[in-house]
Amino acid sequence: MRTSLPILALTSSLAPTNAARAYSEWLASSFIDRQTPIDAGYGPAVLWEGIARAGAHISPTSPLLKAAEAKVSSLVSADGTLDGWDPEWYSLDDIRIGNNLLYFYQRSGDAKLKTAADGLRQQLNRWPRTPSGGFWHRAPIYEDQMWLDGIYMADTFYATYVSLFERENVTAWEEIALQFDLIEEHCRNHTSNLLVHGYDEAKDAVWADPVTGASPLVWNRAAGWYFMALIDTLQVYPSDLPGYARLLGYFVTLADGLERSQDGGGGWWLIMNEGYEAREGNYIEASATAMFSYGLLRGVRDGLLEEKYKAVGLKAYELLVDEFVREDGNGTISFLGTVQVGSLNSNASFEYYTSIPLAENDARGSGAFLFAAIEEELL
């Protein structure tokens, strides 16, 4: 773990502290101590789900869990209106907060949270779709485009909602699986078992392959979002429906690709295409490493992956603690090394992805690290 304290102080003070305090509780508490705000964007949604899970990991009455519940509740008015939500604005990123609403609705039964989630679910019925039935990542900006990111943003919510309130809606379950099927058809490399960032069904984007419509590069966080989407959706998808076996196959296949592409130090490169590891500008990035660690450890715990993947996930987690967690000297810790963004609203080139700055305490990376830390602590 990195530290902002003098090097000589490490031997006497830092190691015992680390041994005594779980990283999930420590990082979650650090965000509370920093009075971190919330909005309905996907980044805060991931972070505050991580804080909520960290609290539940400790106790059903944990102050962390109560703090997260209060934050999420503050986004919804008494009549169930979600702050800033526009029912005519179609961006899959904006569906992600639905998971938080459902998490705390199950906990509290607060009807306003269900009402807000209902609005998101109904919006999915109206969502613009590709000719093959895939949700546009954003309308009208990304017409006919599907990104791996969007699967995590929307389909984990869609699956959770249907599991709670429409369990017998086979049409909905089939549509959820279809979103993964389309990504697999267009974005999977069957040699590396990794997936590129997204595809354009119309093949109009500057980056689109003229045959498949796929973008050219494997951006690690897009693959991380997709890996987490698979493991989280498999928690609620009915195992007796045909889609379950397909999703499980996609998950296991990606785990194989991750094992083979893991760097010797335990992390994953920002751009994961074979041969790019030594390319100047590429680097080991923290948020995706956390996402992969979480998915691998959770997959083993749930019996979906072979035991060998535990070592892969733990190696990644140990790297995160050693290289991307910093003690700040005031009782808090910070999570480092998260790339700020990656978008197909670009030329999708190596130079584009590697030009994006890194951030400290980024909500996306920190939330993913909380997920991974909980899994490591459950071992």
Language-model-detected regions and their locations in the chain:
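Fungal secretory targeting signals
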Residues: 1-19
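Extended rod-forming repeat segments used as scaffolds/tethers
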Residues: 10-11, 156, 369
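Residue-level signal for alpha-helical transmembrane segments in multi-pass membrane proteins
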Residues: 12-15, 234, 377
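CBM-like carbohydrate-recognition segments
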Residues: 20-45, 50-98, 104-120, 127-136, ...
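Short, solvent-exposed loop/turn elements at beta->coil junctions and helix N-caps
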Residues: 86, 140-142, 204, 274-275
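Mid-sequence acidic-hydrophobic segments that form the walls
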Residues: 104-107, 120-131, 157-164, 179, ...
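Acidic interhelical loop/turn segments
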Residues: 132-141, 271-273
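Extended ligand-binding clefts on enzyme/binding-domain cores
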Residues: 148-151, 155-293, 305-350, 360, ...
